C-alpha cells in the first residue's frame, strides 16, 4: 500500500522520496527493487538511510508513515524526531488507535512539529488510483498537506475529492475506526443474506450472482454488493467455484473490536458491529463448530420458498439492516464528537465515504443530505427520508428474520439490527424490571415515571413479605 501511495503521489507531480526498513531474511533491498521496477522512470528517489531520507525533503517536510499500528509507529517516530525541524509534518497513514494518535499529536506539538493521524481506506487499489482520506490532528498542518492529499484522493461522481479535514487530536483515526466497524457489519450482513438466499431458495452461484448484480443497480448499490456478485461467479482453473473451497473462518485485524470497546466506554449501542465481530470470532472456532454440528444435528432439508417474494423480502431486509448499521456508526461518532470535543461534521464524513473506500454506498449521499439538513440530528433514523424507508421495509424485515430463524439459519447481525430497531422504537422497555432487581439485591436505586429524571428512590422490598 505504501508503494502504491508513492506512485500515486509521483503521478500527480509531487516530489517523492522513499525509505524502508531492512529486516534480514524478510525485508531486504525493498527500496532498490521498487525503484528499479514499479517506480522506474517516475522520478522517485530511493534512500537506504533515514538521515539521507529526511535531508532529501524540502522544509517544511511532509513525511508519510505506512507502518503497522502500535509500537512500530512509536519506534519509527522516535528515530525521526531528532532528524526533523520545527514546522515539519508527520502523517501516520496506518490504522492506529485514536488514543495513541492523540498522544502523538501532543508529543510532536510540544516539540514544534505537527502530527496528523490520517485514516486511508480503499486498500492497495485505492492507494494507487484514489482512496478515501480522513486526516485529523494538528490543524496547522492542513494548509500544507491539503493539496497533496486531495490530489491523490478518490473523486466522487460530482468531482469532489474524498478528502477533508476531520478534526483535532485522534479524530481522523477515530473516524477510520468507525468506518472499519461499519465495514465489519456490512460484510456480515451481506454474508448472512447470501447464506439465507442459498438455503431458502436452493440457488446456484450464477443465480445468486445475478440477484446481487440486480440489487447493485438499485438502492443497495455499493462496492461490497458489487464484489459479492463477482465473488459468486469466480471460478478456479479446474472449473470449480472458488467460494466453495474457501474455509469458513474469517480473520480480523482489530479495528472492529476497537469500535465495540469504544461504544461500551461511551454507553452507545453498537449491536450490529458487535455481533459482526462476535460472528467472526465464532467462525474461527471451526473445529468446535464441526464437532457441535455432529452433536446437534440440524435438519438440512429446508422447504424451497417462493422465489420472487423471497428475493424482494431479502432485499428489504438487507437494506434496512445495512441502514441500521450505518445509523449506529454515525450515532457513535456523534457521541464521540460531543464527548471528546471534536465537533465532527457528520455530513462531510458521509461525503468522504462516497468513493474510494470499502463501504462506499449509494445511500451515503442521502446520509450526507440528512445531516446537512439537520446538523444536530440526534439519530439518522429520525430523518424523514430514512424513517419512511425503514417503515416500508419493516414488515418484510420481521417476516424474513422469522423465516431464517425458523429454518435454523444463524443470522446474528441481521437479527441484531432488527432487535436494535425494535428496542429503539419501544416506548416502555423491560428495563424497569432490571432496575427493580438491581435495587432489590444491591440498593442501586431507581427513577420513577411519575417523578423528574435524576431523582432516585430506594424500596425496602422485603417489607412486603
Indicate where each model-derived feature is located:
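C-terminal amphipathic alpha-helical interaction region
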Residues: 391, 396-465
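Rossmann-fold dinucleotide-binding core
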Residues: 73-78, 91, 97-209, 217-241, ...
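Small-residue-rich helix-loop
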Residues: 214, 337-373
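Glycine-rich adenosine-cofactor-binding loop
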Residues: 1-5, 322, 326-327
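NAD(P)+-binding Rossmann beta1-loop-alpha1 motif at the extreme N-terminus of oxidoreductases
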Residues: 1-55, 59-61, 83-87, 123-128
